[in-house]
Structure formats: structure tokens, C-alpha cells
Design a protein with these regions (language model features):
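S-adenosylmethionine/decaboxylated-SAM
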Residues: 3-8, 12-156
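Intrinsically disordered, polybasic Lys/Arg-rich low-complexity tracts
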Residues: 154-183
Length: 183
């Protein structure tokens, strides 16, 4: 994997950790990895590389507010690394975040640092498969900078149908038998 940009969002040690961590999390049921981050592309390349190495059908969806902040862009690093298992989306971050939650088995968040609790509630409410969430907390970057959670979908019990009894109308006409006496 080749990361072309000189700007590094995370240290080399943290990069190795996230690569190994995600690679270990990927299993045969993993379809999509959602990355919400600062658009330097370092983690995008790492996630795409881990996914490509472990399960070639796994796709990385990378979203950010804008995609031209850094040069060279993440797409250039992905292209030179021959990693084509990615989708890069920019703009309207909140909407894209909510749309892509349902598609992801693994979510990496390096954004929303001050509102992570509300974003976790959105994740809990919208996931449809068990999902692993990795949050990079820059305040803990001297230690292990990642907080990991697993969120399972809430399965609501289905309402049971009440047994309905159907009553057939009863014919209430009474027939009287009259006996005729014969003499």
C-alpha cells in the first residue's frame, strides 16, 4: 500500500494497529466498511488494504465533508496501490453518515469527536446486522487511540395476531310442528 500524502492523521504505530485490527474483524459476512474521517486518505488506504487482503469482496465506503482538502487525494493513493474496492463520497456528512450505517459491518469514525454519543445512538437505532464501531479519540492518542464497540440490531418482538373467532349467524326461525288428529 502506498500513501502519497505527507500529512499523517495517525502515527505509524496506530496505522499498523488499525490495519491489523480491521483485518482481524473482517469475516466472511463482511460486506462494507464505513469510514467517516478527515479526508487525508491515510485510513482509507489502510482500510481498503486490509479489506482487500482478507476478503476481496469487502468494500470501503469513505465519506467526508470535502474531498479536495489534501493533495494528493486519497483516490490517487488508492489508485497507485491498486485498491479499487472503495467508494469515496463527499458533502452533506450527516445525511451520508445515516444513509451508509445500514450498509456497514464495520464503522471507523475519526470525526464528530464532540458528538460521538449522539452518533452512537444513531448507529444503535439504524444497524441491521451486528456492527463493530471503531472511534479514534484524539484525546487518547498517547495510549491506544481507538475505542471499539460492538452494536447489535435491536430486534423488536413481533406482535402476535389475536385469534379471531368468526361466528356464523344462526337461523332463529323456529318451525312448529302441528299434529293433526284424524278421527
Amino acid at each position: 500500500m502506498t500513501y502519497l500524502n505527507r500529512f499523517k492523521q495517525i502515527s505509524d504505530e496506530a496505522a499498523n494497529s488499525i490495519y491489523s485490527l480491521v483485518k482481524d474483524m473482517i469475516n466472511k459476512n463482511t460486506t462494507n466498511i464505513l469510514e467517516v474521517g478527515t479526508y487525508a486518505g491515510q485510513v482509507t488506504v489502510l482500510l481498503a488494504g486490509a479489506a482487500n487482503e482478507k476478503l476481496s469482496s469487502a468494500k470501503v465506503i469513505s465519506i467526508d465533508e470535502n474531498n479536495d482538502t489534501f493533495s494528493p487525494t486519497a483516490q490517487e493513493s488508492l489508485k497507485i496501490s491498486n485498491l479499487f474496492n472503495t467508494s469515496v463520497e463527499a458533502g452533506d456528512l450527516d445525511r451520508r453518515f445515516e444513509e451508509n450505517i445500514v450498509k456497514a459491518n464495520i464503522i471507523y469514525i475519526d470525526r464528530f469527536h464532540d458528538e460521538i454519543e449522539s452518533k452512537m445512538e444513531i448507529i444503535k437505532k439504524n444497524v441491521i446486522v451486528p456492527t463493530k464501531v471503531i472511534f479514534r479519540n484524539p484525546k487518547n492518542s498517547s495510549d491506544f487511540p481507538f475505542e471499539i464497540s460492538e452494536v447489535a440490531p435491536v430486534v423488536k418482538p413481533r406482535a402476535r395476531k389475536k385469534a379471531t373467532t368468526t361466528e356464523e349467524p344462526v337461523d332463529k326461525t323456529i318451525t312448529k310442528e302441528t299434529k293433526k288428529e284424524t278421527t
